[in-house]
């Protein structure tokens, strides 16, 4: 463990200007990023008596081996640079906002030609608008059921859309007028996008305009004695009003604001945000925050600053639109307290919005009452998280301890990797590698392997495939470990930078012995290897004649099963994808100069390969990007008999 005194810079060498600093570990990875009004004052505080530091700060400075800094002109520049570096390096000791993905949102895929309305859980993506979150998925479906009467936008998946386009017949929603059926050309892409834009405007708070328009249309239809249409418009108006009733008015002055509140303990904090648009709560989001390692960053003022910087910085990147309805930064941000650099933060937020933003603490009235409601939600979220964390942590700790005791390991296997092989009768043979850290899946470290040497031409050898994946995984680890140039200059981890404590293979004695032989061949002796056989859930250890039998109800066996099943799922998914690509390979793939984009354009234009085969050169050249030479080559590929018969 590095001693902070070994890399402490001389106090006189640290500038007193504002700037941003970063700590690196012995491998060069960035582990913490911070900013300061005075670099000298802030950095000196890290090298005080280690015993007096906050436990997380103490762990950070004893993990680090180097500190470096960049001087900037203003605190606003420091704020922006700190945000950029945290986003780029993802330092392990910085505050991390884990978005509560358990709540569903209503997503609108504006980045598609025909945008889709759908229930969504997961990280935010660029080009997609989100409304919510909602307490339950059924609440979103109920809202969609009401609003698609008035805004008949597409809600189907890409597969369903493609299928109905091919058969030239809409789905049930198209027949009952809850979808405008863009799949069969009932509306154009521009008309469908206008429907979606109106839907987004309604959910953004511009509700009165649509209600007035429907009421006018209803009265006009009644005046023309078109009572059937008037009745339908009356029902549509009722659906709109019921949807509006679901969003309570909390601020009567048409306020556009985000209301932020925190609840914290010594290690973590809960953040809750209510998004108020047009005086109505349009959504609620929550995060759980691991507190920073910075000795001055544990107070509420610092939590406010860090949250605003990370949240609105990411929202601006995902949104980036200047229109008021989709601007990621509201006119007003209400917080429990103002940070010391409130003026700089306000200036930065105003720059993101493109107009003035007010950052203030609500003192009285409805805004104060709403802030107290958000605060109660934050306290409840932190309490629920602590209860859940205690249960999860105890179960995972027990599982890791069970595995350690059953296998006689020197320490608990904090990083477990598992490999599995998937194929059908020797075709499309693939391997998967999944990673669990501290008993939880680390999906960013998952890897696929296309088996090269141990399979091919309809043959497959599972044992040899296990050996191949093991060799490729650990050979890469050794090359990164021994070659300093393989380390990312930005301090990011390479794919196989960390070896596992426990390496699990799906199978029995032959598979585990093959993996063990590869590790022995590579000179790796500090990685335990086991095999988990499916039928009896036996745990096989290299060179042992009998398996280890773990209790059927033990947490350790349950964790190993989860790891093995996840590896199997990941391998099956990749195998199916690879097989599907092979089975759907088109004769167009062989046309020289015809790339994937233009192949899709041809099939989309004609609807099928059969129709394309019947087309003429002139009809094919009507597709954007297709010239005469390419059209001729396409027809030669589709009509090989005719091209051979031609003189």
Curated annotation (Swiss-Prot):
One GO molecular function term of this record is:
DNA binding
- Give the source's domain of life in one word: Bacteria
Q: Which GO terms describe its cellular component?
A: cytoplasm; excinuclease repair complex
User: Where located?
Assistant: Cytoplasm
Q: Which organism is it from?
A: Mycolicibacterium paratuberculosis (strain ATCC BAA-968 / K-10) (Mycobacterium paratuberculosis)
Biological process according to GO: nucleotide-excision repair; SOS response
Residue ranges of domain GIY-YIG in the record? 16-95
Q: Which InterPro entries match?
A: GIY-YIG_endonuc, GIY-YIG_endonuc_sf, GIY-YIG_UvrC_Cho, Hlx-hairpin-Hlx_DNA-bd_motif, RuvA_2-like, UVR_dom, UVR_dom_sf, UvrABC_protein_C
Q: Which SUPFAM superfamilies match?
A: C-terminal UvrC-binding domain of UvrB, GIY-YIG endonuclease, RuvA domain 2-like
Q: What is its biological role?
A: The UvrABC repair system catalyzes the recognition and processing of DNA lesions. UvrC both incises the 5' and 3' sides of the lesion. The N-terminal half is responsible for the 3' incision and the C-terminal half is responsible for the 5' incision.
Sequence similarity: Belongs to the UvrC family.
This chain's protein is named UvrABC system protein C
């Amino acid at each position: 463990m590095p001693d902070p005194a070994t890399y402490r810079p001389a106090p006189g060498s640290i500038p007193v200007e504002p700037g941003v600093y970063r700590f690196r570990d012995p491998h060069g990875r960035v582990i913490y990023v911070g900013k300061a009004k005075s670099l000298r004052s802030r950095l000196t505080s890290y090298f005080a008596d280690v015993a007096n530091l906050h436990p997380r700060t103490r762990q950070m400075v004893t993990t680090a081996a180097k500190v470096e800094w960049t001087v900037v002109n203003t605190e606003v520049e420091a704020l922006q640079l700190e945000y950029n570096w945290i986003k780029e390096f993802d330092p392990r000791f910085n505050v991390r906002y884990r978005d509560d993905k358990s709540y569903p949102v209503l997503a609108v895929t504006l980045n598609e030609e025909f945008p889709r309305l759908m229930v969504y859980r997961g990280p935010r993506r660029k080009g997609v608008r989100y409304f919510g979150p909602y307490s339950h998925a059924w609440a979103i479906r109920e809202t969609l059921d009401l609003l698609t009467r008035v805004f008949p936008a597409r809600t189907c998946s890409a597969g369903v859309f493609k299928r109905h386009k091919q058969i030239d017949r809409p789905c049930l929603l198209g027949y009952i007028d809850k979808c405008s059926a863009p799949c069969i050309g009932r509306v154009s892409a521009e008309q469908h996008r206008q429907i979606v834009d109106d839907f987004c405007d309604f959910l953004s708070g511009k509700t009165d305009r649509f209600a007035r328009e429907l009421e006018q249309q209803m009265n006009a239809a009644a005046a023309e004695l078109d009572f059937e249409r008037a009745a339908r418009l009356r029902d549509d108006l009722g659906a709109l009003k019921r949807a509006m009733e679901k969003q309570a008015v909390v601020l009567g002055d048409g306020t556009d604001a985000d209301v932020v509140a925190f609840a914290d303990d010594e290690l973590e904090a809960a953040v809750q945000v209510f998004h108020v648009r047009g005086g109505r709560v349009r959504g609620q989001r929550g995060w759980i925050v691991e507190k920073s390692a910075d000795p001055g960053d544990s107070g509420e003022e610092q939590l406010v600053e860090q949250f605003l910087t990370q949240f609105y910085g990411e929202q601006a990147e995902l949104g980036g639109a200047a229109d008021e309805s989709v601007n990621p930064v509201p006119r007003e941000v209400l917080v429990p307290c103002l940070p010391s650099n409130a003026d700089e933060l306000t200036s930065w937020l105003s720059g993101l919005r493109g107009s003035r933003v007010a950052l203030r603490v609500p003192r009285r009235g409805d805004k104060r009452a709403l802030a107290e409601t958000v605060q109660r939600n934050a306290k409840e979220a932190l309490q629920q998280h602590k209860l859940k964390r205690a249960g999860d942590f105890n179960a995972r700790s027990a599982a890791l301890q069970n595995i350690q005791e059953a296998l006689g390991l020197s320490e608990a296997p904090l990083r477990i990797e598992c490999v599995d092989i998937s194929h059908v009768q020797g075709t499309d043979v693939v391997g998967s590698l999944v990673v669990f850290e501290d008993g939880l899946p680390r999906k960013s470290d998952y890897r696929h392997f296309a088996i090269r040497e141990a399979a091919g031409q309809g043959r497959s050898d599972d044992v040899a495939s296990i050996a191949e994946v093991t060799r490729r995984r650990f050979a890469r680890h050794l090359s990164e470990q021994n070659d300093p140039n393989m380390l990312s200059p930005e301090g990011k981890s390479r794919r196989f930078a960390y070896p596992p404590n426990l390496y699990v293979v799906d199978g029995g004695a032959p598979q585990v012995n093959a993996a063990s032989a590869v590790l022995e061949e590579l000179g790796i002796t500090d990685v335990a290897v086991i095999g988990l056989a499916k039928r009896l859930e036996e745990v096989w250890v290299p060179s042992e004649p009998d398996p280890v039998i773990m209790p059927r109800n033990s947490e350790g066996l349950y964790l190993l099963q989860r790891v093995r099943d996840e590896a199997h799922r990941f391998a099956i998914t990749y195998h199916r994808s690879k097989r599907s690509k092979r089975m759907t390979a088109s004769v167009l793939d062989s046309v020289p100069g015809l790339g994937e984009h233009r192949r899709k354009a041809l099939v989309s234009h004609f609807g099928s390969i059969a129709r394309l085969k019947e087309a003429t050169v002139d009809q094919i050249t009507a597709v954007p990007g297709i010239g005469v030479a390419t059209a001729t080559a396409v027809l030669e590929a589709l009509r090989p008999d005719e091209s051979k018969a031609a003189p």
